[in-house]
Amino acid sequence: MIKNIENKKISITYEDKNIILPEEIKEKIKKGWQEFKSKNPVLYNGEVTCVNKYESNDTKINISCQKSNFAHYLYDERIGLPLEYSCINISAGALLETSDGYYLIGELDEKMSYPHVLQISGGNVDKKDIENGIVNIMKTISREVMEEVNINLYDNSQVSSLKLKYIYETEQNEKPKVKIFAKANLKITSEEMKNHYNVYLEYLKKNNLEIEFGKIHLLKKNNAIEILENMSNPKREYLIPLVTADLSNC
């Protein structure tokens, strides 16, 4: 479920402490990782920030986090673990809209852990986003957008408005996770964005740098839901609800 959080205070704290898992669970994760790695050798088992406490009311949201690793997260995502041992992921991103009313949707590169999945620009909280035990979620968002599509959210020549606006809270029958989204209106048109990204993509290829989006899709707002529903690519579970929520706020 997508909720508007423009008028809520958000506090995200981080404790530099590993989530405790029983040996049996650790062994399952280890075997699972070996299998995932054999199918996709470029996978990297880096540190992951996981939610261990989430509280929300009408005026504020408090989130507490600890650390685990990508093997734990991926095993839980693909195979599943009991809730008490789950790696409840916290991530953030930005729904980008061009000046002529197109949403920017990224398609993950074939070398990523979820190839060809459609999503907005964003990703997981990183250690560099944490200062004195506080997660700066806007730092996560701006970093990911810069890495993925080479847009500086704080550059007034590129962006006309930026707001922390939405949160995705999983339904009762869904895998628990927390996703926070900003909305950014760009000063460039869809055609300019397409050209901008193509230049950036060539730069990444030329310098042998990581490519997160193999391609981008620019979807006219009034047709975005229909287009997404007709695309055969797998999609992040939040994507259509997020676009629907934003359209209802227009």
Model-derived features: positions:
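N-terminal leader/linker segments that precede catalytic domains of diphosphate-processing enzymes
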Residues: 1-120, 124-143, 151-250
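Active-site recognition of the HExxH zinc-binding catalytic motif
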Residues: 147
